[in-house]
Amino acid sequence: MRPIFIMVKCELGRAYDTAEHAVDEIEEVSEIYSISGQFDLMIKCYLPEDMDVGRFVNSRIHALPHIRDTMTLITFNAFAGRG
């Protein structure tokens, strides 16, 4: 499985609604964080290695309600701390 992060900008006041829909409707979603800055949410997903990331984002993430913009980050390596 390959982790990706999707930064999501939502319509004003609708970030929590969007997060709830994502958790309920998209099984690949692992975690969602509300964040500060130019985006409202950071969604962590685990995708099968052979899944088309662009198609997943376009068909599943962009279909969520109240989304205005996204930025997808594809991971290379994971580093873990001690504890």
Residue ranges and their predicted role:
Residues 1-83:
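A compositional/biophysical signature of low hydrophobicity enriched in polar/charged and small residues
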